[in-house]
Amino acid sequence: MTDSTGKGDDGKLLYCSFCGKSQHEVRKLIAGPSVFICDECVDLCNDIIREEVQEDTSETDGERLPKPNEIKDTLDEYVIGQERAKKVLAVAVYNHYKRLRSGGKGRDEVELGKSNILLIGPTGSGKTLLAETLARMLNVPFTIADATTLTEAGYVGEDVENIIQKLLQKCDYDVDKAQRGIVYIDEIDKISRKSDNPSITRDVSGEGVQQALLKLIEGTVASVPPQGGRKHPQQEFLQVDTSNMLFICGGAFAGLDKVIRERSEKGGIGFSAEVKSKDNTRNLGELLVDVEPEDLVKYGLIPEFIGRLPVIATLEELSEDALIQILTEPRNALTKQYARLFEMEGVELDFREDALKAIANKAMVRKTGARGLRSILESVLLDTMYQVPSMESVAKVVIDSPTIKGESEPLLIYENNEQSSKVAPD
């Protein structure tokens, strides 16, 4: 027993068996069989238990891993077309995070390897959007890196470890969260080797970057300066293990179709050689589906780098019909976004069918894919968005094909049902 002076029955001062503080330094000291614990240590134990319970529940109930068909259904809400690519991604991502849940091993202690992903498709076909949607759905940290800015360590440019630093920034430098994140490296085709033959000159932004990315993608412990500081010898670094990060590399790979066509049309020599006729009817998407590792090597990626990206998903060039769907159908479709902006002004925005066709046709001519749709709409709606907030009684803005082609201005309809002349450009 303890008395009011903080001493035991024998008059000795009592101390917490865990932190060593005396009873005078804490509010309460709880006695057990030959041990004591203070209120501060009890609070600390409660915090530790609470954190562990939260982690356990988030692993099981709170964050159930969606099945491949559920992942694809979510991708369908945001990305039009690209059915095969969405299936490939759904299965690869499901298997990756299933591997993490199992601790990297199967029931019979078989070690499960990591399957990073290579996305090949034309500009504006949805590569970046697919990666962003996956990360948002799985609620994991996500960052985009541009391969064209990367150089080997020691040269002017970004080190590959800067990619991990960006990911850490996205999750407030929570290393555990970052180690389960997704990294999307765009323009990966721009770091292809400049020629098939190894050169004696240093290729610091091509093959050199591929070599630097090898370990990072496969899995290594990267040393990252805390809070985005610059590296210097006396500094303490954050140690980040990339073994459980999912790396998705994407690129347009312009000219890869020619490499595939050359390989597929190459015939043998002699009487028994198979004669292959030239097939010029296959479009870009059909050709890219047949891509083989040897085609990527010929394009300029080193074999070791290709080996770290075992899952290859190819995206098709978007048709005019697909671009029209992209304008109207996804949850965050562009026409819905601009309609919402006008709605905030109390004005309805109406796109006629012929306007949607004209927008899609313009994007096809520019060869910018879905990425070019927003710039077309911004250009068309600029004067209207500038003037309408200052105008009174405007109820509706109508966009038709002549408006998109620049032949006329958007039609304004007022609350008293009068049709305005068109918006006058400044």
UniProtKB/Swiss-Prot annotation:
Gene Ontology annotations for the cellular component aspect, listed alphabetically: HslUV protease complex
Binding site for Zn(2+): 16, 19, 38, 41
Molecular function terms from GO: ATP binding; ATP hydrolysis activity; ATP-dependent protein folding chaperone; protein dimerization activity; unfolded protein binding; zinc ion binding
Binding annotation for ATP: 122-129
KW Isomerase (keyword) present: no
UniProt key word ATP-binding: yes
GO BP term (any one): cell division
A Pfam family this chain is assigned to: zf-C4_ClpX
Entry superkingdom: Bacteria
Record PROSITE patterns: CLPX_ZB
SMART domains: AAA, ClpB_D2-small, zf-C4_ClpX
Keywords: ATP-binding, Chaperone, Metal-binding, Nucleotide-binding, Zinc
Domain ClpX-type ZB: 4-57
HAMAP family per UniProt: ClpX
UniProt cross-references to NCBIfam families, sorted A to Z: clpX, PRK05342.1
Xref: PANTHER family: ATP-DEPENDENT CLP PROTEASE ATP-BINDING SUBUNIT CLPX-LIKE, MITOCHONDRIAL, ATP-DEPENDENT CLP PROTEASE ATP-BINDING SUBUNIT CLPX-LIKE, MITOCHONDRIAL-RELATED
Purpose: ATP-dependent specificity component of the Clp protease. It directs the protease to specific substrates. Can perform chaperone functions in the absence of ClpP.
Quaternary structure and interacting proteins, as annotated: Component of the ClpX-ClpP complex. Forms a hexameric ring that, in the presence of ATP, binds to fourteen ClpP subunits assembled into a disk-like structure with a central cavity, resembling the structure of eukaryotic proteasomes.
Family: Belongs to the ClpX chaperone family.
Protein name: ATP-dependent Clp protease ATP-binding subunit ClpX
Species of origin: Alcanivorax borkumensis (strain ATCC 700651 / DSM 11573 / NCIMB 13689 / SK2)
